[in-house]
Amino acid sequence: GVITERVQGDAVDAQVRDLVVKAIAQLGELGAIVSDIDIPLIAQSATISTAVTYGDVSGVHREGIDKRLKEYDYNLQLRLLAGAILPAQAHQKAVRLRHMLRQQILDALDQVDVLVTPTSSIPASPLPEKAGVESKEAFMEMLGGRRSFTAPFNLASVPALSINCGFTSEDLPVGLQIAGKPFDESTVFRVAYAYEQATDWHT
């Protein structure tokens, strides 16, 4: 099942889209029945994940935030502080939305064996010259998780993996994410292995 909004969405880099579409076509040539799947809440999955995880993590690290915040990595400091000021109502709503999203994903997996999306809306980034978030825009990207598409399957507690599906014109790798039913890792691995054997991205 192809999660259409994750492949054709405006946030997806054009080269990422092209490579993922080619990978999906390759799976079809290998015998997979390809169909489009709609998961309404998936567009909000990164925001849900941020509210759930940041709130939980800041609670666990409350003493560290109060007494030795500077000992944490700078990016982790930002996450902990964001979680510390998150209203309890927002966290509770995110937990409810997580359960709704999980049910939508499970309903989708009742129709297909696996779900496929890009792993990220952009290719793998070069290593930064220095750690830390250097702008408001970068911080909002981090909070919103606009680049990574792994959040929904983490929230749904279903197995997922990322496999290389090609390289951009700048030789940056692009990931194809394959997710399956709970406790059905074997199917996810079989799909990934079949794709890997039909391509040379892994060599």
Where do the protein language model's features map onto the residues?
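Short, surface-exposed loop/helix-turn segments at secondary-structure junctions
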Residues: 52, 92-93, 125-147
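Short, Asp-centered acidic motifs that coordinate Mg2+ and/or phosphate
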Residues: 113-115
